[in-house]
Protein backbone atom coordinates (compact mmCIF):
# COMPACT_ATOMS: atom_id res chain seq x y z
CA UNK A 1 0.00 0.00 0.00
CA UNK A 2 1.41 3.39 -1.01
CA UNK A 3 1.80 6.15 1.55
CA UNK A 4 1.61 9.89 0.93
CA UNK A 5 3.07 12.44 3.33
CA UNK A 6 2.39 16.18 3.34
CA UNK A 7 3.14 18.66 6.12
CA UNK A 8 3.91 15.86 8.59
CA UNK A 9 0.60 14.15 7.85
CA UNK A 10 0.89 10.68 6.36
CA UNK A 11 -1.89 8.54 5.01
CA UNK A 12 -1.99 5.13 3.40
CA UNK A 13 -3.60 5.73 0.03
CA UNK A 14 -6.82 3.75 -0.23
CA UNK A 15 -7.16 2.58 -3.81
CA UNK A 16 -10.79 1.57 -3.25
CA UNK A 17 -11.59 5.22 -2.38
CA UNK A 18 -9.91 6.42 -5.57
CA UNK A 19 -7.48 8.65 -3.70
CA UNK A 20 -5.26 10.55 -6.15
CA UNK A 21 -4.18 13.95 -4.86
CA UNK A 22 -3.88 16.96 -7.16
CA UNK A 23 -0.55 18.76 -6.70
CA UNK A 24 -0.50 21.57 -9.30
CA UNK A 25 -1.76 24.86 -7.86
CA UNK A 26 -2.05 26.43 -11.31
CA UNK A 27 -4.55 23.74 -12.29
CA UNK A 28 -6.46 24.39 -9.05
CA UNK A 29 -6.70 28.11 -9.80
CA UNK A 30 -7.86 27.33 -13.33
CA UNK A 31 -10.64 25.15 -11.92
CA UNK A 32 -11.75 27.94 -9.57
CA UNK A 33 -11.62 30.53 -12.36
CA UNK A 34 -13.75 28.25 -14.53
CA UNK A 35 -16.36 28.05 -11.77
CA UNK A 36 -16.66 31.87 -11.66
CA UNK A 37 -17.10 31.81 -7.89
CA UNK A 38 -18.17 34.88 -5.92
CA UNK A 39 -17.17 35.75 -2.36
CA UNK A 40 -20.56 34.94 -0.82
CA UNK A 41 -21.25 31.71 -2.72
CA UNK A 42 -22.29 28.59 -0.82
CA UNK A 43 -19.46 26.31 -1.88
CA UNK A 44 -19.33 22.60 -1.08
CA UNK A 45 -16.06 20.83 -1.88
CA UNK A 46 -16.12 17.06 -2.31
CA UNK A 47 -13.06 15.24 -0.98
CA UNK A 48 -10.54 18.04 -0.30
CA UNK A 49 -7.67 15.61 0.36
CA UNK A 50 -4.61 17.64 1.32
CA UNK A 51 -6.29 20.90 0.33
CA UNK A 52 -4.81 21.82 -3.05
CA UNK A 53 -8.17 22.90 -4.49
CA UNK A 54 -9.26 24.12 -1.04
CA UNK A 55 -6.43 26.67 -1.08
CA UNK A 56 -7.51 28.01 -4.47
CA UNK A 57 -11.17 28.25 -3.44
CA UNK A 58 -10.23 30.18 -0.28
CA UNK A 59 -8.58 32.84 -2.44
CA UNK A 60 -12.11 33.74 -3.60
CA UNK A 61 -14.52 32.37 -0.98
CA UNK A 62 -13.30 32.93 2.61
CA UNK A 63 -15.65 30.44 4.26
CA UNK A 64 -17.19 27.27 2.85
CA UNK A 65 -17.91 23.60 3.57
CA UNK A 66 -15.94 20.49 2.61
CA UNK A 67 -16.95 16.84 2.86
CA UNK A 68 -14.16 14.35 3.58
CA UNK A 69 -14.64 10.67 4.37
CA UNK A 70 -11.06 9.93 5.46
CA UNK A 71 -10.61 10.66 9.18
CA UNK A 72 -6.95 11.68 8.93
CA UNK A 73 -7.56 13.99 5.97
CA UNK A 74 -10.61 15.54 7.63
CA UNK A 75 -8.51 16.36 10.69
CA UNK A 76 -5.75 17.75 8.48
CA UNK A 77 -8.16 20.13 6.72
CA UNK A 78 -9.63 21.27 10.05
CA UNK A 79 -6.18 22.12 11.37
CA UNK A 80 -4.76 23.61 8.19
CA UNK A 81 -7.84 25.60 7.11
CA UNK A 82 -9.76 26.79 10.21
CA UNK A 83 -12.29 28.78 8.16
CA UNK A 84 -13.42 25.65 6.29
CA UNK A 85 -16.25 23.71 7.88
CA UNK A 86 -15.39 20.02 7.53
CA UNK A 87 -18.06 17.33 7.49
CA UNK A 88 -16.41 13.95 8.10
CA UNK A 89 -18.77 11.75 6.15
CA UNK A 90 -19.32 9.75 2.97
CA UNK A 91 -20.57 12.27 0.40
CA UNK A 92 -23.12 9.75 -0.90
CA UNK A 93 -24.85 9.81 2.50
CA UNK A 94 -24.93 13.57 3.04
CA UNK A 95 -28.17 15.59 3.03
CA UNK A 96 -27.65 18.19 0.30
CA UNK A 97 -31.07 19.75 0.84
CA UNK A 98 -30.12 20.59 4.41
CA UNK A 99 -26.77 22.06 3.31
CA UNK A 100 -28.58 24.21 0.74
CA UNK A 101 -30.97 25.71 3.31
CA UNK A 102 -29.26 29.12 3.04
CA UNK A 103 -28.78 29.07 -0.71
CA UNK A 104 -28.15 26.79 -3.66
CA UNK A 105 -24.78 25.10 -3.61
CA UNK A 106 -21.78 25.48 -5.87
CA UNK A 107 -20.22 22.02 -5.94
CA UNK A 108 -16.45 21.76 -6.44
CA UNK A 109 -14.13 18.79 -6.29
CA UNK A 110 -11.69 16.28 -7.67
CA UNK A 111 -14.08 13.39 -7.31
CA UNK A 112 -12.88 9.81 -6.71
CA UNK A 113 -12.75 7.68 -9.85
CA UNK A 114 -14.27 4.71 -8.03
CA UNK A 115 -17.57 6.43 -7.21
CA UNK A 116 -17.85 9.06 -9.96
CA UNK A 117 -21.11 7.73 -11.40
CA UNK A 118 -22.92 7.44 -8.02
CA UNK A 119 -21.80 10.99 -7.18
CA UNK A 120 -23.08 12.32 -10.51
CA UNK A 121 -26.47 10.67 -10.04
CA UNK A 122 -26.72 11.95 -6.45
CA UNK A 123 -26.05 15.46 -7.73
CA UNK A 124 -28.62 14.95 -10.47
CA UNK A 125 -31.21 13.81 -7.92
CA UNK A 126 -30.48 16.94 -5.86
CA UNK A 127 -30.08 19.41 -8.72
CA UNK A 128 -32.77 21.77 -7.38
CA UNK A 129 -30.41 22.47 -4.47
CA UNK A 130 -27.45 23.14 -6.77
CA UNK A 131 -26.46 26.26 -8.69
CA UNK A 132 -23.41 24.78 -10.43
CA UNK A 133 -20.92 21.91 -10.39
CA UNK A 134 -17.29 22.20 -11.45
CA UNK A 135 -15.79 18.74 -11.16
CA UNK A 136 -12.63 16.94 -12.09
CA UNK A 137 -13.07 13.31 -13.05
CA UNK A 138 -11.59 10.55 -15.16
CA UNK A 139 -11.17 11.81 -18.73
CA UNK A 140 -13.13 8.90 -20.18
CA UNK A 141 -16.14 9.67 -17.96
CA UNK A 142 -15.99 13.36 -18.88
CA UNK A 143 -16.14 12.39 -22.55
CA UNK A 144 -19.20 10.24 -21.84
CA UNK A 145 -21.01 13.16 -20.19
CA UNK A 146 -20.76 15.40 -23.25
CA UNK A 147 -21.07 12.66 -25.89
CA UNK A 148 -23.24 13.16 -28.97
CA UNK A 149 -25.75 10.72 -30.47
CA UNK A 150 -24.13 8.04 -32.59
CA UNK A 151 -20.82 8.02 -30.71
CA UNK A 152 -19.62 5.02 -28.72
CA UNK A 153 -19.47 7.16 -25.54
CA UNK A 154 -23.14 8.17 -25.81
CA UNK A 155 -25.30 6.35 -23.30
CA UNK A 156 -27.42 6.52 -20.16
CA UNK A 157 -25.16 9.01 -18.38
CA UNK A 158 -25.07 11.43 -21.31
CA UNK A 159 -28.82 11.36 -21.96
CA UNK A 160 -29.85 11.75 -18.33
CA UNK A 161 -27.41 14.55 -17.52
CA UNK A 162 -27.98 16.44 -20.78
CA UNK A 163 -31.75 16.25 -20.28
CA UNK A 164 -31.64 18.02 -16.93
CA UNK A 165 -28.37 20.00 -17.08
CA UNK A 166 -26.12 22.00 -19.38
CA UNK A 167 -22.88 20.01 -19.49
CA UNK A 168 -19.59 21.48 -20.77
CA UNK A 169 -16.18 19.83 -21.12
CA UNK A 170 -13.71 22.48 -19.91
CA UNK A 171 -10.16 21.11 -20.13
CA UNK A 172 -7.98 18.03 -19.82
CA UNK A 173 -5.65 17.45 -16.84
CA UNK A 174 -2.57 15.28 -17.30
CA UNK A 175 -2.07 12.36 -14.93
CA UNK A 176 1.41 13.68 -14.04
CA UNK A 177 0.00 16.34 -11.67
CA UNK A 178 -1.37 13.77 -9.20
CA UNK A 179 0.16 11.76 -6.36
CA UNK A 180 0.08 8.83 -6.59
CA UNK A 181 -0.03 9.06 -10.37
CA UNK A 182 -3.19 7.42 -11.76
CA UNK A 183 -3.16 5.28 -14.88
CA UNK A 184 -5.42 7.67 -16.81
CA UNK A 185 -5.77 11.40 -17.46
CA UNK A 186 -8.50 13.56 -15.94
CA UNK A 187 -10.73 16.36 -17.18
CA UNK A 188 -12.73 19.21 -15.67
CA UNK A 189 -16.43 19.48 -16.48
CA UNK A 190 -19.04 22.15 -15.78
CA UNK A 191 -22.58 20.99 -14.99
CA UNK A 192 -25.32 23.61 -14.63
CA UNK A 193 -28.81 22.34 -13.70
CA UNK A 194 -31.49 23.66 -16.04
CA UNK A 195 -34.11 25.89 -14.45
CA UNK A 196 -36.94 24.84 -16.80
CA UNK A 197 -39.59 22.62 -15.25
CA UNK A 198 -39.53 19.04 -16.56
CA UNK A 199 -43.07 18.49 -17.83
CA UNK A 200 -43.16 14.68 -17.59
CA UNK A 201 -42.72 11.89 -15.05
CA UNK A 202 -39.02 12.23 -14.20
CA UNK A 203 -38.64 8.84 -12.53
CA UNK A 204 -40.47 7.19 -15.40
CA UNK A 205 -38.29 8.98 -17.95
CA UNK A 206 -35.06 7.97 -16.27
CA UNK A 207 -36.19 4.34 -16.09
CA UNK A 208 -37.17 4.53 -19.76
CA UNK A 209 -33.69 5.77 -20.73
CA UNK A 210 -32.06 2.90 -18.84
CA UNK A 211 -34.39 0.41 -20.51
CA UNK A 212 -33.71 1.89 -23.96
CA UNK A 213 -30.00 1.22 -23.53
CA UNK A 214 -30.62 -2.14 -21.84
CA UNK A 215 -28.75 -4.01 -24.55
CA UNK A 216 -26.92 -1.59 -26.83
CA UNK A 217 -26.91 -3.86 -29.88
CA UNK A 218 -30.69 -4.32 -29.76
CA UNK A 219 -33.18 -1.99 -31.41
CA UNK A 220 -35.42 0.31 -29.40
CA UNK A 221 -38.33 -1.99 -30.25
CA UNK A 222 -36.64 -5.04 -28.78
CA UNK A 223 -35.46 -3.23 -25.65
CA UNK A 224 -38.82 -1.57 -24.96
CA UNK A 225 -41.50 -4.04 -26.10
CA UNK A 226 -41.68 -5.97 -22.79
CA UNK A 227 -42.34 -2.82 -20.77
CA UNK A 228 -44.28 -0.37 -22.96
CA UNK A 229 -47.20 -0.23 -25.35
CA UNK A 230 -45.50 0.90 -28.57
CA UNK A 231 -48.64 1.18 -30.71
CA UNK A 232 -48.92 4.98 -30.39
CA UNK A 233 -45.33 5.72 -31.44
CA UNK A 234 -45.21 7.82 -34.61
CA UNK A 235 -42.20 10.11 -34.19
CA UNK A 236 -39.34 7.59 -34.01
CA UNK A 237 -38.34 4.56 -36.06
CA UNK A 238 -38.19 1.85 -33.41
CA UNK A 239 -35.78 -0.15 -35.57
CA UNK A 240 -33.11 2.34 -34.52
CA UNK A 241 -30.81 1.77 -31.58
CA UNK A 242 -30.95 4.03 -28.53
CA UNK A 243 -27.54 5.53 -29.28
CA UNK A 244 -29.02 7.12 -32.44
CA UNK A 245 -31.54 9.32 -30.61
CA UNK A 246 -30.94 12.87 -29.43
CA UNK A 247 -32.07 14.00 -25.99
CA UNK A 248 -35.05 15.75 -27.59
CA UNK A 249 -36.04 12.55 -29.43
CA UNK A 250 -35.88 10.57 -26.19
CA UNK A 251 -38.30 13.06 -24.61
CA UNK A 252 -40.67 12.90 -27.59
CA UNK A 253 -40.64 9.10 -27.64
CA UNK A 254 -41.22 8.86 -23.89
CA UNK A 255 -44.38 10.96 -24.16
CA UNK A 256 -45.76 8.59 -26.82
CA UNK A 257 -45.26 5.45 -24.73
CA UNK A 258 -47.60 3.87 -22.21
CA UNK A 259 -46.18 1.47 -19.60
CA UNK A 260 -47.59 -2.03 -19.77
CA UNK A 261 -49.29 -3.28 -16.59
CA UNK A 262 -47.08 -5.38 -14.31
From Swiss-Prot:
Q: Which GO terms describe its cellular component?
A: cytosol
Q: Where in the cell is it found?
A: Cytoplasm
**Which chemical reaction does it catalyze?**
adenosine(1518)/adenosine(1519) in 16S rRNA + 4 S-adenosyl-L-methionine = N(6)-dimethyladenosine(1518)/N(6)-dimethyladenosine(1519) in 16S rRNA + 4 S-adenosyl-L-homocysteine + 4 H(+)
Enzyme class, one word? transferase
Q: Which UniProt keywords apply?
A: Cytoplasm, Methyltransferase, RNA-binding, rRNA processing, S-adenosyl-L-methionine, Transferase
Residues the record lists as binding S-adenosyl-L-methionine: 20, 22, 47, 68, 90, 110
Q: What is its main location?
A: cytoplasm
Entry's EC annotation? 2.1.1.182
In the record, what terms sit under GO molecular function?
16S rRNA (adenine(1518)-N(6)/adenine(1519)-N(6))-dimethyltransferase activity; RNA binding
**Domain of life according to the entry:** Bacteria
Function summary: Specifically dimethylates two adjacent adenosines (A1518 and A1519) in the loop of a conserved hairpin near the 3'-end of 16S rRNA in the 30S particle. May play a critical role in biogenesis of 30S subunits.
For this chain, the family text in UniProt reads: Belongs to the class I-like SAM-binding methyltransferase superfamily. rRNA adenine N(6)-methyltransferase family. RsmA subfamily.
- Protein name, entry field: Ribosomal RNA small subunit methyltransferase A
Which gene does this sequence derive from? rsmA
Amino acid sequence: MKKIEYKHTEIAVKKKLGQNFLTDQNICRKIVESAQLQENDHVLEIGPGFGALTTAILEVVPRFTAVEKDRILAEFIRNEYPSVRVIEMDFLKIDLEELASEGRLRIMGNIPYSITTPILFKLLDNRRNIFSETLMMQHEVARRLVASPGSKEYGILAVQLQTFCDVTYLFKVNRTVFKPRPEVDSAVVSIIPKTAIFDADETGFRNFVRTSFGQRRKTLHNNLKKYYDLSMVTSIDLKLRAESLSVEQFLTLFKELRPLPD
